[in-house]
Amino acid sequence: KSAVEPENIRITTVKTSPAFVKFEIYAQAPCRITLEIGHGLQDDEVYFITESKDSDECGNVALLIKVENARLWSAENPYLYRYRITAGADVSTGTFGIRELSWDAEKGFCINGVRTILKGACIHHDNGLLGACCYPDAEERKVRLLKETGYNAIRSAHNPCSKALLDACDRLGMLVLDEYTDMWY
């Protein structure tokens, strides 16, 4: 079992100007954790931030990272950073965007201080004739077609979105309301 599973990494934008990003990493055991951050989606680029810290006795680490001259994520410009987390011999990678969400009575919903009108659609987890299985290319196509039609938001109807669909939304600039389940408690 990997020391750091992707679902055990929480990334939060603390503020955008200057940009501070908090990484909360939950390892399976105490170890030294190294975090590297790079620009864009190409893994051959150099990582420009490297931080290391020893985890506590439960394997938990929190790192607050300042990102100089940060490029912000928005629906119109979905800029993503890459991260690589090393814990012992295990490596976990992924992407994240830096953005600030706010709501107020005058402007409504804002991304990075810019008023944003949601133009959304409810989508089901299936891919038509392909069925309910997740195919990354089909998920990307679904998001791309919605984006090209003028949508900037989706709500998953009755089931959670697949990881592939959420990743496509991050890359293409689609906001998501990810429904937990179609069930009353």
Regions found by a protein language model. Name each.
Residues 1-176:
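Secreted/periplasmic carbohydrate-active enzymes, especially glycoside hydrolases
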Residues 183-185:
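Short gly/pro/ser/thr-enriched loop/turn and capping motifs at secondary-structure boundaries
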